A protein has these predicted regions:
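Conserved amphipathic alpha-helical "coupling/scaffold" segments
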Residues: 1-148
Length: 149
């Protein structure tokens, strides 16, 4: 980055703006992504992101905001499970929370019916209610596993 670019970011107080944006995010990963944002200079990319923002705002106005409050970081747990490692009850409950969130967000999207530039993101979501329920029925709390598990 050039000195002029960095000076412009300071003058615009981008770090303060991004901190305010991060305060609105529901997950730690979301907060981190907000703080890491940088201005774009590609007109097509800017146009697409503006269209996505408009579409998301329209959905929120019509239906309210989808809930992401259950999202906890699970990437490390999934990587360990993929390598054959064992997961703790806490990790399994977090994964169940992510699966529940995916199911709820997919249902949120399905209610709309209007095509938007966000469709590609919603279509990538794959709920797995069977696994979600298997986890929640088997793990009673962070320290208690059901006898039938």
């Amino acid at each position: 980055m050039t000195e002029l670019y960095e000076k412009s970011l300071r003058k615009l107080e981008l770090d303060n703006v991004l901190a305010q944006l991060a305060d609105c995010a529901n997950s730690e990963d979301g907060k981190d992504r907000c703080r890491a944002l940088l201005p774009l200079d590609d007109a097509e990319e800017i146009r697409l992101l503006q269209q996505q923002t408009t579409a998301a705002c329209g959905m929120i106005v019509r239906k309210g905001a989808p809930g992401f409050h259950e999202l906890k970081p699970v990437a490390a747990s999934l990587e360990r499970a993929d390598r054959g490692g064992c997961l703790t009850p806490v990790e399994l409950l977090r994964i169940a929370g992510v699966l529940r969130c995916i199911r709820n967000v997919k249902a949120y999207y399905s209610e709309d019916g209007e095509p938007t530039v966000l469709d590609v993101y919603f279509q990538e979501l794959s709920p797995n209610r069977y696994l979600e329920e298997k986890i929640t029925n088997s793990i009673l709390s962070e320290e208690e596993i059901a006898d039938a598990a």
